Amino acid sequence: MNHTVQTFFSPVNSGQPPNYEMLKEEHEVAVLGAPHNPAPPTSTVIHIRSETSVPDHVVWSLFNTLFMNPCCLGFIAFAYSVKSRDRKMVGDVTGAQAYASTAKCLNIWALILGILMTILLIVIPVLIFQAYG
């Protein structure tokens, strides 16, 4: 067996900086820059889902429940709004959107029926008073 010892560092420092050699690979990378491949460069796109804003219509449902509640539509809309908020807190965006859509539809109907009932409760007594008064 051949045992030879190679020293990579000189034991004596004469006060001058060591002599560095430029390696061929380092020189080529510095001169050439980016590698030249025949294939076009590819890119990776990462989609990070931002928190989707799902309106739960709780305030609107509460308004319809307290002030105009024809056929209990406001109360039912409030229940669906709370379910939508619960689904959103869990992270189920699809379920939250489904419950919110139902709550919105119920709120629209509750508002329309409430306005119609209010108008009729004002118009009918006025018409009766004019007819018999």
Curated annotation (Swiss-Prot):
Highest taxon above the source species: Eukaryota
Protein topology in the membrane: Single-pass type II membrane protein
Phenotype upon changing residue 23 to Q: Accumulates at the plasma membrane. Loss of anti-SARS-CoV-2 activity by enhancing Spike-mediated cell-to-cell fusion
Keyword annotations: Antiviral defense, Cell membrane, Cytoplasm, Endosome, Immunity, Innate immunity, Isopeptide bond, Lipoprotein, Lysosome, Membrane, Palmitate, Phosphoprotein, Signal-anchor, Transmembrane, Transmembrane helix, Ubl conjugation
InterPro entries: CD225/Dispanin_fam, IFITM_antiviral_protein
UniProt region (Interaction with SPP1), positions on chain: 60-93
GO CC list: early endosome membrane; late endosome membrane; lysosomal membrane; perinuclear region of cytoplasm; plasma membrane; protein-containing complex
Induction: By IFN-alpha and IFNG/IFN-gamma.
Cytoplasmic face residues: 1-57, 79-107
Keyword Ubl conjugation: yes
Intramembrane sequence windows: 58-78
Residues passing through the membrane, by range: 108-128
Subcellular location as annotated: Cell membrane; Late endosome membrane; Early endosome membrane; Lysosome membrane
UniProt PTM comment: Palmitoylation on membrane-proximal cysteines controls clustering in membrane compartments and antiviral activity against influenza virus and hepatitis C virus (HCV). Has no effect on anti-SARS-CoV-2 activity.
Modified residues (Phosphotyrosine): 20
Lipid attachment points (S-palmitoyl cysteine): 71-72, 105
Extracellular side: 129-133
Gene Ontology biological process: defense response to virus; host-mediated suppression of symbiont invasion; immune response; negative regulation of viral genome replication; negative regulation of viral transcription; response to interferon-alpha; response to interferon-beta; response to type II interferon
One Pfam family it belongs to: CD225
Family designation: Belongs to the CD225/Dispanin family.
SUBUNIT field: Interacts with ATP6V0B. Interacts with CD81. Interacts with SPP1; the interaction reduces OPN expression. Interacts with VAPA. Interacts with BRI3 (isoforms 1 and 2); the interaction with isoform 2 is weaker than with isoform 1.
Job description of the protein: IFN-induced antiviral protein which disrupts intracellular cholesterol homeostasis. Inhibits the entry of viruses to the host cell cytoplasm by preventing viral fusion with cholesterol depleted endosomes. May inactivate new enveloped viruses which buds out of the infected cell, by letting them go out with a cholesterol depleted membrane.
Name used for this protein in its record: Interferon-induced transmembrane protein 3
Gene: IFITM3
